[in-house]
Each structure stands twice: as C-alpha cells, then as structure tokens.
Amino acid sequence: MASGLGSPSPCSAGSEEEDMDALLNNSLPPPHPENEEDPDEDLSEAETPKLKKKKKPKKPRDPKIPKSKRQKKELGDSSGEGPEFVEEEEEVALRSDSEGSDYTPGKKKKKKLGPKKEKKSKSKRKEEEEEEDEDDDSKEPKSSAQLLEDWGMEDIDHVFSEEDYRTLTNYKAFSQFVRPLIAAKNPKIAVSKMMMVLGAKWREFSTNNPFKGSSGASVAAAAAAAVAVVESMVTATEVAPPPPPVEVPIRKAKTKEGKGPNARRKPKGSPRVPDAKKPKPKKVAPLKIKLGGFGSKRKRSSSEDDDLDVESDFDDASINSYSVSDGSTSRSSRSRKKLRTAKKKKKGEEEVTAVDGYETDHQDYCEVCQQGGEIILCDTCPRAYHMVCLDPDMEKAPEGKWSCPHCEKEGIQWEAKEDNSEGEEILEEVGGDPEEEDDHHMEFCRVCKDGGELLCCDTCPSSYHIHCLNPPLPEIPNGEWLCPRCTCPALKGKVQKILIWKWGQPPSPTPVPRPPDADPNTPSPKPLEGRPERQFFVKWQGMSYWHCSWVSELQLELHCQVMFRNYQRKNDMDEPPSGDFGGDEEKSRKRKNKDPKFAEMEERFYRYGIKPEWMMIHRILNHSVDKKGHVHYLIKWRDLPYDQASWESEDVEIQDYDLFKQSYWNHRELMRGEEGRPGKKLKKVKLRKLERPPETPTVDPTVKYERQPEYLDATGGTLHPYQMEGLNWLRFSWAQGTDTILADEMGLGKTVQTAVFLYSLYKEGHSKGPFLVSAPLSTIINWEREFEMWAPDMYVVTYVGDKDSRAIIRENEFSFEDNAIRGGKKASRMKKEASVKFHVLLTSYELITIDMAILGSIDWACLIVDEAHRLKNNQSKFFRVLNGYSLQHKLLLTGTPLQNNLEELFHLLNFLTPERFHNLEGFLEEFADIAKEDQIKKLHDMLGPHMLRRLKADVFKNMPSKTELIVRVELSPMQKKYYKYILTRNFEALNARGGGNQVSLLNVVMDLKKCCNHPYLFPVAAMEAPKMPNGMYDGSALIRASGKLLLLQKMLKNLKEGGHRVLIFSQMTKMLDLLEDFLEHEGYKYERIDGGITGNMRQEAIDRFNAPGAQQFCFLLSTRAGGLGINLATADTVIIYDSDWNPHNDIQAFSRAHRIGQNKKVMIYRFVTRASVEERITQVAKKKMMLTHLVVRPGLGSKTGSMSKQELDDILKFGTEELFKDEATDGGGDNKEGEDSSVIHYDDKAIERLLDRNQDETEDTELQGMNEYLSSFKVAQYVVREEEMGEEEEVEREIIKQEESVDPDYWEKLLRHHYEQQQEDLARNLGKGKRIRKQVNYNDGSQEDRDWQDDQSDNQSDYSVASEEGDEDFDERSEAPRRPSRKGLRNDKDKPLPPLLARVGGNIEVLGFNARQRKAFLNAIMRYGMPPQDAFTTQWLVRDLRGKSEKEFKAYVSLFMRHLCEPGADGAETFADGVPREGLSRQHVLTRIGVMSLIRKKVQEFEHVNGRWSMPELAEVEENKKMSQPGSPSPKTPTPSTPGDTQPNTPAPVPPAEDGIKIEENSLKEEESTEGEKEVKSTAPEATVECAQPPAPAPATAPATATAPEDDKAPAEPPEGEEKVEKAEVKERTEEPMETEAKGTTEVEKVEEKSAVDLTPIVVEDKEEKKEEEEKKDVMLQNGETPKDLSDEKQKKNSKQRFMFNIADGGFTELHSLWQNEERAATVTKKTYEIWHRRHDYWLLAGIINHGYARWQDIQNDPRYAILNEPFKGEMNRGNFLEIKNKFLARRFKLLEQALVIEEQLRRAAYLNMSEDPSHPSMALNTRFAEVECLAESHQHLSKESMAGNKPANAVLHKVLKQLEELLSDMKADVTRLPATIARIPPVAVRLQMSERNILSRLANRAPEPPPQQVAQQQ
C-alpha cells in the first residue's frame, strides 16, 4: 500500500502498550461526544460559516477491528516534529449522525504489537523520506535567511540553546518566542512575510533539534508502528454497500470495538474475521500539511471535483447508498460523501503521482488569520489552518484523517473514497484481500457516546451498545441487524409546529433467554425493561388541528432536526409542560360530566393547548373533486387566519360539518344559480334557507320605517329609536344620492346602524353590493360580530392578514370563478366580467392602499369608512387612493367630525362630494368668520343633508350621567428628588440662552411626566428598587415611591368594597407594567390591553372582562390603543392615570365605559400631580379643547397640534419655584403637615368624599362646552365663541400662535446654583480631580438679569439664542424717563401684546406687524443698523412703524434679532417658531448691522471733540433759519449719537471688547458668534491700546491727534448692545484674511515695522483699493485745486476748530498714506475744506450714522455735513456731477469700512495674544516683500547712473530689474495660493476657545449697564 506523500515521522525502537497510554496525556482534546447534539458549543463563532469541499484519498476499511478514538488522537499527536512533515492520513469511519456528532474517525490498534513493528516503522520512514526528497526536488523551500535577504530585511542572530530545544516543543511556543525577535529587527514586516519566516525558522529549528531522536520521536514511532500492526488485521471487503438481504446462513450481526473511555484496552479480534485471513499490515499516512503560497489567489475547486459531485449526486439517489445526511433532512448536498469510483490505479501511476507531490484544491492560506505559511489541510473540506490558529491550538499535527472545526461542527466526516482525479488513489498492497472493506461505522455508541463493543447497523454507520438500545438486547442478534434509526417509521407529513411533549409508555420488555448451561431450577432471568421515551404532539403543515398526532422523539430528530433543536432549546426537556392552558378547571369539569363529546375532545386536543375554536368551522371557502369523484372542502377555521385553512375530505367527522357544507352550496346557488353539487348527497340538516333578495326594490327607501322591519326582527335584536331614525336618514340619503357623515357621539352604535343600513339595501333589493368597509384593524372583529348579528344573510369577508392569508382570500373568497384573479402573493386586478362572491368586504386602512390593484378593480356599491378622521388630510395616501376607487355611495363614520379645524371638515366634505366642495380657499373665506350667526346658519344649511350627529345626552335621557373629577396628587419624596434632578440635569437645555430647542424641551417634559407617574420608569431608580425573589418590585416600596399609587391604593380598596369595576388608562406601557405589579401585590384580578395586543387577544380580554360574574376588578388600557371601538360598559369607574397631550384621546378613553349598556353612573378620575408639568398640561389641554371647538382656525391643519417651544417652557416652569422653595424651607426634607396648607392629604374621609357618586361634576365645563357645541342642530353643530368680541381688529384676527411674555432668566435664577453644585459633585465623583471653577462676574450677571426681567417683554424660549440688542438698548435706559406715548397708541400696560402669529384678512401678522411693516422694519435695519435704545424717538421709526406702541416695537426687535441668531438654512420657509422668513438673508443683514455698529462706535469716539457740525459757522445760520435746536433731533435729521451710546470720554473699559466681538462675528461668516463679552470686557482695553499705538503709519502728519484718540478709543464704551452685530460679516474680501493674519500682528514691534505684508490677503485685495484710492486722489486734488479762491476765508475759520479722528488699521490699507498726502496738500494750499482728507472722512461716517447706509444725497443735503460738498464745488457745472460725487463717496466709504474692520481685527488679535506663525505662507510672502524692498532701495542709485549713461551701471540695473521681476512673479504666485490657506482658518468657536453654545448664549446676554457716571452723562 503506498504511503502518504509527506516526510516520515522519526521513530525509535520498541514501544510498549504503556507508551500508548502515555500518549493519552499528549493528545488533542477529544471531540466532546457529550456535546454531540449541539456542536456549536465547541466551536468559535468565526469557524462556523466557512465550508468548502475537498477531495480526500481513499483507504480500504475494515469494520471488524475494534478501534480507540483517543489512541488515534495520540498517534496523530506524536507524528513528526512540525506541521510540514505531517501527511494526509486515512479516516476510517463514515459519520452519519443526524445529531451532528463530533465523532472523528481514527486508526485501529491491535492488542499486541508484533516483533516486526520496528522494522515496519523504519521501512515506512525510509519510504517517506524518499518521497519527501522527491517533493523537495520539485519545490525546495527557501531558508529563513534567504527569505529575509530577498526582502532586504535583517535576520535575527539568536543561537538556540539546549534549553530552547527542550522548552520550545511546539510551533505555538516557538512562534511566541521568535516572532518578537523578528519584529524588533524588522518593525515594518508584513504579517504574511512574518508567517513565512516563522515557518522557515521552525523548519530549521525542528531539523536541528538534537533531541528529535529521543522521547518525542520514540513516541511517534511507537504510534506509527502500532497503527501498522493494527492494519495487519484489516481485511479488505467489497466496497459497495451490501445488496438487499438474501437467504444466507445465520450469522451474528456486525460488531466492532469502539473507542472511548470505556473501550477495552486489549480487545479481542472480531468474531467475524477468521484468523487465517489477516492481510499485510498497512502503513499509516501522516496528516497532510501544505505550505501555502503567499499572496496567491484562492483556488476554486477543480472541474474534476465538480464532476465527482455530479456523480455522487446520482449515486446518492440510489436506495442502497447512504451518506452523512441519512436521517437528516437539513444536511446540504455538499456534505454528502463522494462515492468511490470503481477504477484502480496501477502502481506505476501511483509512483508518478508521488513524485509530483500532491496537488489539492485546498486554500493556501489559513482560514482564521488569512495568512499563508505551514498549514494543515482538512480532509473533509478545502479549508486549511495554522496549528496555532485552532481553538484549542494543536501542539502537534494529528495523524490520520483530520476534520477541521468547521466540519466537526457541521457534522461532516471523512469518508473513504476513490479520487482518481487527484492522483491520490491508494492501491491495496500485493497480497491484500480484494474483499477487504473499510469500516465506516461510528466509533462511539450513538446513545451514550462511549466506546466498547458496539453493535453495528447493516445499512447505516450507527453503532450501539446492546444495553443502550430501548428495550435493551440481551445478546448480539443473529443475521442482519437494523438500528432504531433505520427502522424508524417516516412521518406522515411535514411538521408545522410542535405543540407539547410528554413521556410515552416504555416499550415491552425483552425476554432474556436462559443460558444453555444454567441450572434448570434457577428462575428465568428477568426480562430487560425498556425506558419511557418522549412523545411530541405536532401540528402538520396544510392539515387542520383535527389531524394533530403524537410522534416519537427519534422521528422528530431524524426528520425535523432544526425544529427539534429549537424546541429543545426553548423548553424544559426534563419535566413535561402541564396540560393547564388557562381554562377554568371547575367549568370544564362540569362540562365534561354533561357532554361526553367534549370530554373526548378535551382528552384528545384541548388539554394540549388547542383551543376549541380552532377545531370549529368558520366557513367553507371552496371545494374540489379528485379523480375518484371524492369531494374535498377548503375550510377556514374560527379564530385562525386564512393561511391556516385546510382541505378536508367530505366524510371526515367534524362538528357541524354538514351544516356548513349545506350553507356553502346554498350561497353558491344563490350567487351563481348552480343546482348540482358533486359527491355524496348531503344529509338533511335544519338550515334556514337563504332567501334570494328581490330583483327590484320592494320598498321606497324615502319612506320612514315607524318600526323595525321583519328581517331585523328575525335577527333577534331590537334597534333603539334613535338608531331607527339614523337608519331612515341613511336610507333617505341613499335614495337622494347624497353621500353622508354619520357623526354620532362615541358609544351610540354607529357600527350597528351601518350594518343594518347595508342589510336593508340588500334585503329590499336596492343593491346586492359589493360593499366595502374600511375600519381600524382593532375594530374589525367588532364589525364581524355586528354583521353576524344584524345581517345574517350577507356574506361578509374580512380581508386582513399577511401576504399568504390575503392570497388565499383572493383566490377563494373574491369570486367563484377559478381564473377571475391571477394567483400569487401579489394582488392583481380582477377580471371585469367575473362575479363577486361576497356582499361585504371588511378591510383595514392600510390594505386599501397596499392592495389597491384588486380592490380598485371592483365596482363598489357603497364605501363605509369608520373613524373617518383618517380622511381629514387630502394629502394622505389613504385619501388619494380611495378617491381613485369606483364608489357609487359614500358613508363616513366619525365620533369627532371637527377634531381640529374647518379645513379638516372641508377635506371630509371634499372626499364625499368633490363636485360640490372643491374650492378650499373659497370655503375657508366664506366661513372665515364663523362666529357670526348668519355664517353658522349658512354652514348648517350646507352641512344639513350631509351630516347627522346625536349626543348621548340627547338620546339617552335616562342614561346614567358621568362625572369627571380632577384629582390633584402630591409628589412623593422620591419623585421630588427625581423631579429636581431632571430639571438640574437639563439646565443647559432649559436656559433660554443655552440654545435649548423644541425637541430637547419636549424630552424634558416627557421625563418630568414619567417622574410624576412613577420614578421606577427611570432605569436608575428601577435598578435600585427593592425586588422580590421572582423579579417583581416590592409592593410597599413601589406604592410609597409614587403619590398617585398611594392614592390609587386607597381608592381601589374602597371601590372594590363598593362592588365597582375600574378602567385605568395610562399613556405609557411601562407604567402599565408597574400597575400590573401593583395590582398583583394588592391581589386584584385584572385584564390588560395595549398597542402590542392585537385583535383576537384584545377581543378575548374584553369578553372575559364583560362576562357575567367575571372576577376581574381592573382593566389596564393604554390611552391610545384602548381608545377605539372597545366596549367596556361593565365598568363604572375610569381612572386616567396620566393625561394625554390630546384631550380627544382621553375622551375616547373614558367613552369606553360611558356608552350604551351602562346602567350605573360613571365616575372619571383624572390624576394630576399638583404643581408639576402635569397640572399645566391639563390646563393647556383644556384650552386646546376650547380652541379646537370654539375657534375655527383655517391654516396649517396638521401642524397646529404640536406644542410651541413657548408652551413647553411655560409647562416646564409650572410649580418649579415652589418645588425648590420646599427644599429651602424644609432644609431638604419632606413637607411637614401644617407647614404648607397647599399640600393635599387624602385621609379616609377625603377618599370617601372623592368616591361619593352623588357629587356634582366640578371641572367638566370644557367637556360640556365641547358637547354643547353641537346642541343647536342635530346636524353639523358648530360653536360660537362665548367671549364678547373686542374691537373689530381683534375680531378679525385669527390667532395662529400666541407669544407670551417670559422671564428669560427664570431657569438661570432657579437652577444655576443647583446645576453648578451638581457639576462639581459629578467631577468629584468621577475622580477627575478638583475642578478649576470658571470665573463668573456675578455682578454683571445680576445687572443683565434685572434688565432682561424688567423690560424684555417677549423674550421667549422659542430660540436657542434669545437676545437682541434692540432690547438691550431699551433696557439699559429703562430707568430714564420715556417720551410720553403718541396719539393713537394706548399705554403699554393697557394693551396686551399681539399674538406671535395671526391671520388678519388673509394676511399673516407677526406680533401685530403686517407684511408692509415687516418690510419697513427690515429696510430700517439695512439703513441704520440695529435700532438704538431710543429708536422710538429717532429717525429710526419710519412712517410705516409709527402706529406701533413702544412695547410692540421692542418685542418685534427682540424677535427679529433672535431670528437672525437662529442657525438654519436661508432656504427654509419659516423660522423655528413658524414665523415666515420672507426671503430674509441673514448674511446681508448681519453684515450691515456689523458695519453700522462699527461706524457708530467710531463716530461716538470722537464726537465730543469734533462737535455736531462739520462747519460750525453754518450752525448759527441754520438756527436762525429753522429756529430749531441741534440738540433735540428732528425726525428727519436726528442727532448722530443715540443717547444710549457711551460718551467717548468715559473710560469705561468695556466697549472695544464688546464691539470687537461684534466684528469678530462679522468677520467670520460662520454666524457662529463671538467671544464672550465678559472676558473681553476685562482685558480688551489694554489689548486694544497696545495695538492702537503703533498702527498709524504717518505719525508726522497725525501726531497726537491720531494716537491720543486712539488711546482714548480703546476704552470707549461701545454703543448700544450690538453683540449681535458681531455676527455681521463686514467685508467678504478683507474679512477672513484679516482674521487669520491678525494673529501675526500682535507683537507691537511687528506692527511698527509696517506689517502690511503680514496680511497678504488683504494687501492683495487692496490692490484694487489702491487703484480706487489713486483715482479718488486725482479727483480730490483736481477738485481741491479749482475752488482755491472761493474758500480762503472759510479755511481760516476752520483751522481754529479742534478736530480728532483716527482709524488704527495697522497699515493694512492705503488709508493712512492717503491721509498723509491729502493733509499735506490741504495744509500747503490752506484748502482745509476743499481738499478731501481725514476730516471729511469723519463727517462722512457721521452722516451715514444719521441718514443711513449709502444715503449720499441726504447726507449732502444736511447742513451739518456741508463740508462734504466743499471738494466738489468746482465740478458742479459738469454734466455727471452727481454721479462723480456719489461714486467718490461710495469708494471712499468702502475704504473706511475696510479700515474699521481691520482695526477691530487687530484689537482682537492683541486681546487674544495671537502670535505670528513663521511657517504660514503669508510670512514667506513677507520675507519676499522685504527682499524686494531691500533690493530696490539698495540699487536706487543705479537708475540715476544709468540715466547718466553709465553702461556698466545699466547692465547691473537690468539684472536687478530682472531679479525684482522674478521676485514679484514669485510673490504673485504665492498670493494666488493664499486664499486656500485662508480657507483653513479655524472656526470662531475654536479661536475663542468657547463652545458654539457658549458663544450663542453670550450673544443672547445683554451688555452690562454703564457705570453710574456714564448714565448721568447720558441723561
């Protein structure tokens, strides 16, 4: 026999049996047979999914020699030093274990090792060495040194010591030792290369191992020899499986010696093998190891492999073949064995194969780490592994056939087979027995997983101990023996689900034959007892519950492995489940006694969890006839979906089967006129014959029924009089062709009236249908019941369920014709000519849209939509799809026709009669003023024919009343703790300036609502809560934790004693969980419904609760899920545990009890936690209730429902002050009684009073109002507002959104201290060390707070950033006396603020500002910047705004500024609070505000020096002319300075900083905001001064004048709080560059050096400016020179006037050089007025402040700024004089604007201590510029010499010029690259080291009040 293809294992001389035992200690862990059933547990996740098939060599098998699994492992472990020496070894047993056994086959061992052993192992080694040599010839691996050299890496110079060779005995240990050494030398080595080097190193290490001949080797040799000797006992037999049994002489069944802990050490030879027939021993091939190629592509399996697969597939089909998957339906075909091919190879061929080395289709990388190297190959799939990557890792390669962990898990085992495509065929050795057969049987007993003598099955690989069989066998049987698995009967079908299991009866015992030599007197041996086995009760796929039956465990295990495993996992398999399925034992016992049939069914089915309904026919859907003429019926079972319908034969015994067959044929006959029916004649059954409806109408529908017709009497029901009236009205409307809305109040039986209406149409011959009813899924069961009761002759189909159910309904219930609808799960159109089988189709809203294909293809006689407010939005898909259906008549049912507004009502009417109601605008316009009587009458007339609405109060005069009481409850101490904690934790979100948004506030409200309900709703509290052993909360602690539960406990006790029953509603399902625990603790029985409980279960719970004598005392419902179509009239007390946001949901909820059938007074208790968000929500809900019904609001229907941020903030504040006050007064303790009279205590008396049912309702007014709003008409009731109408304006205004006055600092004051305390505690607890507290100027804060509180009328939390300068300005001077109100304006206090959003005459108003006024306001902002604090008295108030009160104006300014600060896309249509944006561009507005604030600040700085008149001599003239005082501003030409602005002399240090901020923001277009004022305030002055001294580049011309003011200016107080302005972006070009480069300019020296180049970008931008400036200069000079003579006198006067003005732009603009030149010219020529210079610039800015941005004409016309006209006087006669003048002013202003921005940047740079970054590209530009300058200056003389004709100088000059040119072109290139570097400027937030939120909140803060002396000056 040829050996394997690898190198041999070294072996030593003798080896004893003890050696084999010793090997047990070294072996791989055994494959855990005890885990056979679930091998997943043995393997890591990663190994499971990768399965790939590989080819294996074949080896003959012998079943007769016993084998030991563990010994096989030992042998494997001892073979060879390293993985590369191990060759593929044979696997000897086939595994066909459906349980997924981990059994791995191994080699056999003979009891005695013969003397030939050593010789054998030597010859084996020799042969293997030869083969290895051949292998090496073909592919010699490189040494590690060669590999490293090839890759250019360093080798390690470690010399292995003797100790190393002793300790590093396996690859893993070696790898762990050597790998770090290699990595240290070559840190960047790739993993794949590392693996190759390690492999090579290990190979060398193993080869050089001096100990390899000793113990380890001898062990291996012993193992090899042992195996060889074992092989000598193997006899070859025929490969093919045994043919079908024939008559043969009796022989013993097959046995074998299995492996395992109990296997015998020295087993005897098998009795079936004659000693004479021992074949020659075979050699053991070691396991295959492959050295994977690195980086090679993963191979796909070869084509031969595919061929084999095909072949094996054919073979597998044969009856006699067996495979791994025998008995396992879930096995994949890939795992089947590839059967051997019959061909044998010749020896020569085999040798050739050996020379070639083996080629496999294995992957050449490790499955786990995906790297190559030395890998061992799996024999049952193409995977390969490193030994160290296995889990657990192998120390030595296993010998023989080895399956990888994946195959072990999948249950795939190696099977011997021929594989001639791979050239690995192994021939039998000469002299071998051709009959020899491989033993494919399991090595372990299938039952106990142990070894020993095993009985082998003749047709499958299973083996058993005879004592493990059930019943046990006394001895090995004779002849062929089939195991239990092979004799296991097949299942009768596919199992759908396992219902239950039980222990079966043990099989009858096996008699033990008396031994022949036994004493005849001894008693016969005791028969062997069998064991009871599990029996499983299963439901079969496609069969009804009638066919459920018991199957054995083995059957399930074989045929439904996955299902069986899953069932085992989920259920206790030791103790069978009890048979009690919630039925009432007492009742069922009584019934069993009376009804033997029931007793039988109980015994067979019901006790095992099958409900009686599932075995009752609901209806027969269809029939079919088979070839033999037998009829089968498709039956739909009660309470089961359609996909559980099953075909049953006509002669099956089923209760009422004949009745249903009869009704099926009756209906068929009725609809199709068919008489004949196939099959047996039906038995006569008493069944009311269906009457065919008349062909033509028999009754005039317009005639009223005085009493109900006979066909209704036949149903046994009686309609109420008002229902008869409803029926008459519906029939009348049908006759008139009027589509209708039945809007009766909830609980008046709209469903019944509708069913009766449809039934009357059918019975009277008006229509046979089909009728379509669309209802909420939860109410469909109720609809079914009502139709069953009131319309028994109608065929009603419920079209709901999953795809499968609906497909069955479509195929069988839509039409009698087979091909009317295309089959399949996708709905398709129904054929036009096909007749419809049903009369009524009930379906849900969703399916109307999902299955519109089929439903839309049917012509419906009538559509009914239940809960029709689903149609209130004409944009919904439901509305649009339903509109496309073919509908002859429409009826809408709704209990709340006017749930929100008139628009929704219009949509309902539009759906009903689109031809009449199609113009929404017209409709809304017509009824815009619904408050007027005639309008209401008109609307009622219009609605009259379409709507009918009755109230319970109208129709049930004797119906018990209902009383709703609001029960105020206290917070428990624990709730108070959490309430405070939630508020404190969310301080940032609550604080108006902290940037909280609507969502975060809503989250806070929800948390507080949870806290009011129960603190255990928070995970933290739930974790800490004391629990009982069973996991439920401890009852007393649960109750103590919540004020509501404390009260509920007392109430329920009294209610229970009084015999009342209670419904408890909560919005939160988790609260319902807690209530369940509470009720369990109190011992009350209850039912529960929430959103997770669907139709059937829901109805069952309701039925149980409503059943007479039901024990359930409480019913827990979730407000929304329990709100629709549920009748719980047996309860008379409703407790609303927490109120819903939407009051309609609460009304829906308590209407569950207050409805038809109620005979007791209903008490409704609404729990409301006092002084909490709940109390406020209840108030808001009441207000909403009144609004929704009293105020008809056209408008954004669906959007109006959500809470505004304002409402949320208001809700959150409610009660908080008191809560935190408690803390202060009680010292943190609980409220003491008597301390606070407002605390509510419920003692017994109070509870009695509360539960007294005679008390009158105290707080139900809003509900009465709601119900009475329809009292005037039975049709379309509408309500008039009861408030008396104010002035006309108020009447017309429709409030869309109200804005309330809010104290923005409420949270700041309330929570700041708590919050900071909490933060400190957190920091301390988290161990972050002591926190350095941020310095907070509390003084400033308190001043700001006071301002905000006193004056800010409308600052609300609708904005993340909620501050505006306008307000600040007003507020700073709030103490100063205001101007009295003008005519036409009421006093602020008299008139409340207008609502935030309102609609007046179709136009939207914002805080009372209409579109024109809003536009005017925006224009004023763009003209003047921020409104000053006295805007009310200045030019600021344009004509359009004069009608506004000061309060309104301030409120609007505040709102406008908050909108500017609100982040968001400019494209949005509205701001966060719903105010329309109207195309407002924040960027432009902020830019303008910023520029104007800079100008205003600059003018104020020098105003006290320069006065108010540019040419003071004109002042007197003007005074005389106009008789007006310059001090008091006229509306047109007001004072330049706004009184609020700081006087320039005041050395208040804050201003620059503040304005710095302004621009900061401007400068960065990120609208993020600027640095915090407070910090800036403190340090800015110094910074500014520092920056201010150097910048003026012309100290000569502007000596003290320039710098002194500059110094002065630094501390000047900024104008009114223009922090917002900061956001404005001033000049796009200069802005950002300045910002960046400003960093570089902080150092004073730099600035002095003329750091113009520092800010290269600006310089670049300024090139344009320079050109402009030069032009301006020309114009100026020309202009200046012409009028010389005219202005001499003026100049003399002027020279005496004191003047100061400077802009410290650091030389970054041309301004100072211009000023220098201009002033020089002006001084020389004495034309101070005529030549434009610094003075003119100041007055230009002053004019802009007074007249507005770019109002050049107004400025020129103002005599105060006459100086600006002087330079242009000479040009007056030119045609384009005005154009020249305006262009010049505009360009000059641009330059000033730029300079102002730079000045601000420099101040900030200084303040922020920015330093130059030498690596910045602009610095390179700076050095280049210095080079240019230096080069130019040092060679100035050359030009003169060159001009003088000096030729050498000329040549040098050319070179210098060339150098200059190069330098300049380099600079130009650098400049073009600069913008890219600018783009990387960090955002404002980063540069300010502040978070965006802090910046925004800073912006929202108002500026501090000026110091007292300043205020005095202002006044």
From Swiss-Prot:
Record carries keyword Nuclease: no
Bias (Pro residues): 506-515, 1528-1537
Matching SMART domains: CHROMO (SM00298), DEXDc (SM00487), DUF1086 (SM01146), DUF1087 (SM01147), HELICc (SM00490), PHD (SM00249)
Catalytic reactions on record: ATP + H2O = ADP + phosphate + H(+)
Annotated Acidic residues bias: 35-45, 128-138, 304-316
Start-end of PHD-type zinc fingers: 363-410, 442-489
Domain Helicase ATP-binding span(s) in chain numbering: 731-915
GO MF term set: ATP binding; ATP hydrolysis activity; ATP-dependent chromatin remodeler activity; DNA binding; DNA-binding transcription factor binding; helicase activity; zinc ion binding
InterPro entries: CHD_C2, CHD_II_SANT-like, CHD_N, Chromo-like_dom_sf, Chromo/chromo_shadow_dom, Chromo_domain, DNA/RNA_helicase_DEAH_CS, DUF1087
Modified residues (Phosphothreonine): 360, 510, 522, 696, 1535, 1542, 1546, 1656, 1682
Cross-link Glycyl lysine isopeptide (Lys-Gly) (interchain with G-Cter in SUMO1), where in sequence: 704
Region (Required for interaction with PCNT): 1570-1915
CDD domains assigned to the protein according to its UniProt record, in alphabetical order: CD1_tandem_CHD3-4_like, CD2_tandem_CHD3-4_like, DEXHc_CHD4, PHD1_CHD_II, PHD2_CHD_II, SF2_C_SNF
Summary of subunit composition and partner proteins: Component of the nucleosome remodeling and deacetylase (NuRD) repressor complex, composed of core proteins MTA1, MTA2, MTA3, RBBP4, RBBP7, HDAC1, HDAC2, MBD2, MBD3, and peripherally associated proteins CDK2AP1, CDK2AP2, GATAD2A, GATAD2B, CHD3, CHD4 and CHD5. The exact stoichiometry of the NuRD complex is unknown, and some subunits such as MBD2 and MBD3, GATAD2A and GATAD2B, and CHD3, CHD4 and CHD5 define mutually exclusive NuRD complexes. Interacts with IKFZ1; the interaction is direct and when in part of the NuRD complex. Part of a complex containing ATR and HDAC2.
Similarity comment: Belongs to the SNF2/RAD54 helicase family.
Reported function: ATP-dependent chromatin-remodeling factor that binds and distorts nucleosomal DNA. Acts as a component of the histone deacetylase NuRD complex which participates in the remodeling of chromatin. Localizes to acetylated damaged chromatin in a ZMYND8-dependent manner, to promote transcriptional repression and double-strand break repair by homologous recombination. Involved in neurogenesis.
Protein name: Chromodomain-helicase-DNA-binding protein 4
Organism: Mus musculus (Mouse)
